[in-house]
């Protein structure tokens, strides 16, 4: 995530072996690997979304400029396109690939800052997804996933999933394809799954002691 110069605690520079996957440098090293990076992101998405992820394409540190020269641009840590397959068949031309942005963030952002940042990210991402003359219903789903070592909303939840909805009637279907998922590494409310708990613990403390399943074992080999 851009503007990462302020971390939760002011720390002296650490050696590479002291870094964890929430640290920007190590995370970028992981996602930048031509093959390992895609597999790492596939495992992350599989664990976070709790469903099968067949194949992904990853663009590390994707830069999206502002809409004008004096407007704010953004840098996405891991821009991911999921290739959606139907029952193991080839990718259908009419099926739009879902877009994911995974953002480990150790910067403590108070109040409105984090939600407004995500609003801005979504807006700029969308400007690059729809070619001229293309129908709006071809706009792909976009999910921004933020992984945090602090609780962004104070409810001690490991998972906060944010979607737009009708205020007056929650039963109204409003599928704009926009979703934010905030993951608090230490959250306990909401009965988070064991695999997600273990993965987030490993991301915060990426040591062999926290390797608890085959997926994390594979990620740990990439880290080493």
Q: What residue ranges belong to the model's regions?
A:
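Elongated, amphipathic alpha-helical interaction scaffolds
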Residues: 1-224
């Amino acid at each position: 995530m851009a503007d990462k110069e302020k971390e939760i605690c002011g720390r002296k520079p650490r050696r590479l072996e002291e870094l964890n996957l929430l640290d920007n440098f190590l995370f970028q090293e992981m996602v930048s690997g031509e093959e390992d990076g895609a597999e790492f992101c596939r495992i992350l998405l599989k664990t976070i979304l709790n469903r099968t992820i067949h194949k992904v394409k990853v663009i590390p540190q994707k830069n999206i400029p502002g809409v004008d020269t004096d407007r704010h641009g953004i840098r996405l840590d891991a821009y991911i396109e999921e290739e959606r397959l139907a029952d193991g068949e080839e990718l259908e031309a009419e099926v739009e690939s879902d877009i994911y942005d995974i953002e480990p963030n150790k910067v403590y952002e108070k109040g409105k800052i984090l939600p407004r940042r995500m609003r801005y990210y979504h807006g700029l991402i969308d400007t690059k997804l729809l070619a001229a003359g293309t129908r709006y219903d071809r706009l792909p789903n976009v999910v921004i996933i933020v992984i945090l070592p602090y609780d962004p909303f104070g409810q001690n939840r490991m998972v906060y999933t944010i979607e737009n909805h009708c205020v007056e009637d929650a039963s109204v279907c409003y599928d704009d394809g926009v979703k934010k998922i905030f993951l608090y590494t230490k959250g306990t409310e909401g009965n988070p799954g064991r695999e997600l708990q273990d993965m987030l613990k490993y991301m915060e403390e990426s040591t062999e002691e926290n390797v608890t399943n085959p997926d994390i074992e594979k990620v740990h080999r990439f880290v080493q």
